[in-house]
């Protein structure tokens, strides 16, 4: 039910704030804002009625209104007190916390994008490999029988056993390293990658027909005919240097008596110049046979008929000279540890295809000279090399 407002009562201006039914603070704020705008303070008891959605009427008796400046100051003070209380609560919580130190290993996380440089990785890998692998022994490539025979020879001799054993094993190790180096060189020589890299793609020459205009051919023919007509007949005759009278400037008998000088072998520079000249004047292959001939010269194909010993620089030595080396052991004793040691040495040399006969004989000669130097000491201990 709505009450009528008499006409003599002056209506109050609408504050523009949303009002809710039964809210005391809103009604007070509605009454304070117009007064704050004008700067006056109302002290009379007034009854404020507002419309609401419900049937009840909101009313408030204001005994005394408060200025707007005081309300804003109170609100700011209340906010400041709230912040201070929050800070105090946080400080209390932090004080109550206990810090526990952990002695576990700290793992530093590396950024995902960054990677160590390549040279650092290779250096670290080599260091780890060097630390992980045990050091190589000098006699790791030698057979245990050969090492045992060398130690037996050293035990049988009267002088320092360790020095004698080390000298013998050192010579054997040197021989083994030479043979291994030659095997690596041989493998490197027959590598498939080297064959492919040296191969050249042969292109068939394109048949080009030189077409000249007709007037140019006629012009050339005319020029040739005019020159041939002008040349005399004597000029066109062929002259031979070995016909006619001799001038007798040189003595023919002196040159005949001189023996022909032996032809010297071409030097390295001449051979290299001939190779360069051949490559410059080289023409594409006409067929497959020419290509196979060239590959045979370069060592990419076997010679035909097939020769298994092709490319071996062995000074023409026979096969049996590589295998049967017992004839070089005549100066050594017939029995005993020295004989056993030398038999093992010759057995290893006969199975080595990478050493020439001269190198094998030199290897045996080294041991002969070594024992001959110790001949006086061996005689004192009743050990004879030729027994």
Swiss-Prot record:
Q: Where in the cell is it found?
A: Mitochondrion
Any one GO cellular component localisation term in the record: mitochondrial small ribosomal subunit
Any one GO MF term held by the record is: structural constituent of ribosome
Assign the protein's first listed, main location to one coarse class.
mitochondrion
| Listed Polar residues bias regions | 66-76, 207-217
Annotated region (Disordered), positions in chain: 59-83, 203-228
Transit peptide interval: 1-56
Q: Which InterPro entries does the entry mention?
A: MRP-S31
Q: What keywords does the record list, in alphabetical order?
A: Mitochondrion, Ribonucleoprotein, Ribosomal protein, Transit peptide
Superkingdom per UniProt: Eukaryota
The entry's family comment says: Belongs to the mitochondrion-specific ribosomal protein mS31 family.
**Self-association and partners:** Component of the mitochondrial ribosome small subunit (28S) which comprises a 12S rRNA and about 30 distinct proteins.
Q: What is this protein called?
A: Small ribosomal subunit protein mS31
Q: Which organism is it from?
A: Rattus norvegicus (Rat)
């Amino acid at each position: 039910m709505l009450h009528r407002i008499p006409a003599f009562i002056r209506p109050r201006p609408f504050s523009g704030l949303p009002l809710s039914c039964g809210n005391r603070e809103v009604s007070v704020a509605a009454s304070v804002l117009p007064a704050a705008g004008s700067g006056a303070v109302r002290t009379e008891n007034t009854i404020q009625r507002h419309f609401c959605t419900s049937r009840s009427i909101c009313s408030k008796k204001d005994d005394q209104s408060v200025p707007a400046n005081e309300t804003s100051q109170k609100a700011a003070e209340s906010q400041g007190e709230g912040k201070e209380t929050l800070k105090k609560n946080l400080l209390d919580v932090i004080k109550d916390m206990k810090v526990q130190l952990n002695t576990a290993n700290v793992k530093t996380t590396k950024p995902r994008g960054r990677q160590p440089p390549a040279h650092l990785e290779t250096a670290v890998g080599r260091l780890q490999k060097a630390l992980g692998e045990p050091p190589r022994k000098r006699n790791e490539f030698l057979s245990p029988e050969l090492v045992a025979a060398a130690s037996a020879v050293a035990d049988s001799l009267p002088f320092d056993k360790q020095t004698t054993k080390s000298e013998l094993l050192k010579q054997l190790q040197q021989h083994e390293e030479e043979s291994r180096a030659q095997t690596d060189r041989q493998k490197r020589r027959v590598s498939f990658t080297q064959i492919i890299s040296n191969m050249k793609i042969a292109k068939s020459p394109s048949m080009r027909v030189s077409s000249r205009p007709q007037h140019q051919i006629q012009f050339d023919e005319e020029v040739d005919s005019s020159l041939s007509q002008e040349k005399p007949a004597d000029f066109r005759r062929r002259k031979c240097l070995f016909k006619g009278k001799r001038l007798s400037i040189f003595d023919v008998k002196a040159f005949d008596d001189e023996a022909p000088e032996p032809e010297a072998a071409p030097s390295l520079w001449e051979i290299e110049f001939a190779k360069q000249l051949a490559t410059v004047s080289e023409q594409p292959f006409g067929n497959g046979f020419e290509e196979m001939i060239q590959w045979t010269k370069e060592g990419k194909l076997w010679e035909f008929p097939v020769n298994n010993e092709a490319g071996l620089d062995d000074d023409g030595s026979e096969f049996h000279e590589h295998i049967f080396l017992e004839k070089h052991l005549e100066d050594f004793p017939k029995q005993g540890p020295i004989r056993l040691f030398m038999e093992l040495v010759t057995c290893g040399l006969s199975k080595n295809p990478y050493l020439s006969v001269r190198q094998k004989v030199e290897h045996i000669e080294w041991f002969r000279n070594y024992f001959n130097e110790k001949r006086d000491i061996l005689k004192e201990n009743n050990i004879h090399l030729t027994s």
